[in-house]
Amino acid sequence: MNIIEATVAAPDARVAIAIARFNNFINDSLLEGAIDALKRIGQVKDENITVVWVPGAYELPLAAQALAKTAKYDAVIALGTVIRGGTAHFEYVAGGASNGLAHVAQHSEIPVAFGVLTTESIEQAIERAGTKAGNKGAEAALTALEMINVLKAIQA
């Protein structure tokens, strides 16, 4: 039996982070967590990290697709926050971002990590951006790095 597993260390990885500007008071913490994880745990060099700002979470799939198509990156990390309000807008934005990023991940040759918070409240978002529920930006970064190494192992 063959078992393929991988580590998160990827010192030569080239990683793009697509991040939404909307709700940036939360997304800034996701970005800090992602960059810290890439550098400190993944040992990714600063010059191999590219950050691309987009207006909101709904625009993340298009940015991720464009980044993947350049063939400059080994992975794309999508970061954003969608907080439920009093209208159906949440479902459209959260669903569009989630489905769109899944589509890009399935049709590109590189990992696309999902670091988009979809929460019921601002408090839940803050908890998931670095307080008591960890930092989902850091988790997405580690997922991207592990998947880079998993795909390399599969192709070896």
From Swiss-Prot:
User: Which positions are annotated as binding 5-amino-6-(D-ribitylamino)uracil?
Assistant: F22, A57, Y58, E59, T81, V82, I83, F114
Describe the reaction catalysed, as an equation: (2S)-2-hydroxy-3-oxobutyl phosphate + 5-amino-6-(D-ribitylamino)uracil = 6,7-dimethyl-8-(1-D-ribityl)lumazine + phosphate + 2 H2O + H(+)
Q: What Enzyme Commission number(s) appear in the record?
A: 2.5.1.78
| GO CC terms | cytosol; riboflavin synthase complex
Pfam families found in the cross-reference section: DMRL_synthase
InterPro entries, sorted: LS, LS/RS, LS/RS_sf
* Metabolic or biological pathway: Cofactor biosynthesis; riboflavin biosynthesis; riboflavin from 2-hydroxy-3-oxobutyl phosphate and 5-amino-6-(D-ribitylamino)uracil: step 1/2
> Which BP terms from GO are recorded?
riboflavin biosynthetic process
What would be an example GO MF term here?
A: 6,7-dimethyl-8-ribityllumazine synthase activity
Q: Where is the active site?
A: H89
UniProt binding sites for (2S)-2-hydroxy-3-oxobutyl phosphate? G86, T87, R128
Coiled-coil region: none
Q: Does the keyword Transferase apply?
A: yes
Keywords, in A-Z order: Riboflavin biosynthesis, Transferase
Q: Which family does it belong to?
A: Belongs to the DMRL synthase family.
Classification via NCBIfam families: lumazine-synth (TIGR00114), PRK00061.1-4 (NF000812)
| PANTHER family, per database record | 6,7-DIMETHYL-8-RIBITYLLUMAZINE SYNTHASE, 6,7-DIMETHYL-8-RIBITYLLUMAZINE SYNTHASE DMRL SYNTHASE LUMAZINE SYNTHASE
Function statement: Catalyzes the formation of 6,7-dimethyl-8-ribityllumazine by condensation of 5-amino-6-(D-ribitylamino)uracil with 3,4-dihydroxy-2-butanone 4-phosphate. This is the penultimate step in the biosynthesis of riboflavin.
Subunit-structure text:
Forms an icosahedral capsid composed of 60 subunits, arranged as a dodecamer of pentamers.
Question: What protein name is recorded for this chain?
Answer: 6,7-dimethyl-8-ribityllumazine synthase
